[in-house]
Structure formats: C-alpha cells, structure tokens
Amino acid sequence: MWFEILPGLSVMGVCLLIPGLATAYIHRFTNGGKEKRVAHFGYHWSLMERDRRISGVDRYYVSKGLENID
C-alpha cells in the first residue's frame, strides 16, 4: 500500500535535514554563539564593516549596543 513508503521517506527527509542543521550549529559554535552573516549585496557588506568598526575588537558579531557607542 501507499503507507509502505513512509519509513523510507522519513529516513530520506532526516538525512537531508542533518547537514543544514549541523552547519548552523557549527557556525554558531565557532562564532561565539552568533549566527553567521552573509553579505550578498554591497550594502550588507558595508553594514558588517560598520559593525566590525563599532565593536572595538575587530569582529562584526560582537555587539556593544546603542547605549555603549560613543
């Protein structure tokens, strides 16, 4: 019957899901708990560079917050 394909389909779905989740967790671990940002456009790149300059430690993912910016 049609339901005999469900176990194989679920195994295939899990195998396709694992690399995406693993990549997200590896990036989060290596970047100190922050998500990895990707600059697809020049404007996004300039925002990342601004965040890097503002952070004071030369890393775009370390935020100071608006109240701490001089």
Swiss-Prot record:
Tissue localization of expression: Primarily expressed in heart and skeletal muscle.
GO MF terms, alphabetically ordered: NADH dehydrogenase (ubiquinone) activity
GO biological process, one term: mitochondrial electron transport, NADH to ubiquinone
Membrane topology: Single-pass membrane protein
Subcellular location, record wording: Mitochondrion inner membrane
A Pfam family: MWFE
GO cellular component: mitochondrial inner membrane; mitochondrial membrane; mitochondrion; respiratory chain complex I
Main location: mitochondrion
Transmembrane segments: 1-21
Superkingdom, taxonomy of origin: Eukaryota
Keywords, in A-Z order: Disease variant, Electron transport, Membrane, Mitochondrion, Mitochondrion inner membrane, Primary mitochondrial disease, Respiratory chain, Transmembrane, Transmembrane helix, Transport
InterPro entries documented for this protein: NADH_Ub_cplx-1_asu_su-1
PANTHER family: NADH DEHYDROGENASE [UBIQUINONE] 1 ALPHA SUBCOMPLEX SUBUNIT 1, NADH-UBIQUINONE OXIDOREDUCTASE MWFE SUBUNIT
Family note: Belongs to the complex I NDUFA1 subunit family.
Medical condition linked: Mitochondrial complex I deficiency, nuclear type 12: A form of mitochondrial complex I deficiency, the most common biochemical signature of mitochondrial disorders, a group of highly heterogeneous conditions characterized by defective oxidative phosphorylation, which collectively affects 1 in 5-10000 live births. Clinical disorders have variable severity, ranging from lethal neonatal disease to adult-onset neurodegenerative disorders.
Known function: Accessory subunit of the mitochondrial membrane respiratory chain NADH dehydrogenase (Complex I), that is believed not to be involved in catalysis. Complex I functions in the transfer of electrons from NADH to the respiratory chain. The immediate electron acceptor for the enzyme is believed to be ubiquinone.
Subunit field text: Complex I is composed of 45 different subunits.
Name used for this protein in its record: NADH dehydrogenase [ubiquinone] 1 alpha subcomplex subunit 1
Species for this entry: Homo sapiens (Human)
Gene: NDUFA1
